[in-house]
Design a protein with these regions (language model features):
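Conserved catalytic core of the tyrosine transesterase superfamily
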Residues: 1-320
């Protein structure tokens, strides 16, 4: 057996701020998602405000500092345990990277015990309100588009960031699939589309004029790409107009997962459909292997469950 040797700490460890800049540079080199890099930057600001002096050497941070950081949140009295752990995730990733570089002594950064919050999905009544087709002869393009978006969110379970980065060329109506390029884990997946969602997208694209394959799938009334905030505002307005107080876009993803499992879908297949890199992200479910993602998909899909009894009306042209 090869004898293990201990490496000495770096002779000149960088400052806290300098180490973090190196950490983020490495994250970009590793091709982490922009969302992950932004997350680290946002949470680092809070941590650095707590530390006050970020020009001191990184090796001055101790396990006691991390414990004091936890108490710092606790003393506020308004920060949930889940939020504390969210902040600790950045601290742990950053400090463990520094420890690997021998910038500082090793010590554990532990998450605190936290009750997992119960995220109430959209109810059947709320979904019926949201999925009810608008009057296409009188509604605005924005309302019609929002209705299609809600159908898309429930029919695919995709994230908001994935949706706003979709291009028209990502939709293959002949194959009934959608290519999700912009995923949190930086992987790309080809997900199936149900017949109903395929018909809605075909109709929606029929109302789009002078488009190119690389144009955004979902756009503003002026044909420009939707930003994250614009999408959130659109769904907030749409849901409230339909008498639904819940306005979370991500809640459609949770609703998708719940209804899918309730219909008998297996968790491993769900993991693939949601684009999770491993089963840790679907830890509520048992890992079962499945190859064919399209088998019985219309039966299992939440959108089909909620709308299978809805009569198809004749196509009505949107008013110009």
């Amino acid at each position: 057996m090869k004898k293990r040797t201990l490496r000495a700490l770096s002779a000149t460890p960088p400052s806290i701020h300098g180490a973090f800049e190196q950490f983020q540079k490495q994250n970009e080199v590793k091709n982490l998602s922009p969302e992950t890099i932004k997350f680290y930057s946002a949470k680092a600001k809070t941590f650095f405000l707590f530390l006050e002096d970020t020009e001191q050497c990184i090796d001055t941070i101790t396990e006691e500092d991390v414990e004091d950081y936890i108490l710092y949140f606790k003393e506020k009295g308004t920060v949930s345990d889940t939020t504390i752990n969210t902040n600790l995730r950045m601290v742990r990733a950053f400090l463990y990277w520094c420890m690997e570089r021998r910038y500082m002594e090793r010590f554990p950064v532990r998450m605190i015990r936290a009750d997992e919050p119960i995220k109430e999905p959209y109810t059947a009544d709320e979904l019926e309100r949201l999925l009810k087709a608008p009057n296409k002869s009188t509604c605005s393009f924005a309302e019609y588009r929002n209705w299609v978006i809600v159908n898309f969110l429930l029919g695919t379970g995709c994230r908001a960031s994935t949706l706003i980065n979709l291009r028209i060329e990502d939709i293959d109506l002949s194959a009934s699939t959608v290519l999700f390029r912009h995923m949190k884990a930086r992987n790309q997946i080809v997900a199936p589309l149900t017949r109903r969602l395929g018909r809605l997208l075909e109709e929606y694209l029929g109302y789009r004029n002078e488009t190119t394959p690389t144009d955004p799938l979902f756009v503003s009334e002026y044909g420009t790409a939707l930003s994250r905030s614009a999408l959130e505002n659109a769904i907030w307005s749409y849901n409230h107009k339909r008498g639904v107080e819940k306005t979370s876009i991500h809640l459609f993803r949770h609703t998708y997962a719940k209804l899918y499992i309730q219909a008998g879908g297996d968790p491993f297949r769900l993991q693939k459909l949601l684009g999770h890199s491993d089963l840790a992200m679907t830890r509520k479910y048992v890992a079962l292997y499945a190859d064919d993602l399209k088998a019985n998909y219309d039966v299992l899909n939440p959108l089909e469950q909620m709308t299978h009894n809805v009569r198809r009306d004749n196509k009505i042209k949107l008013s110009q």
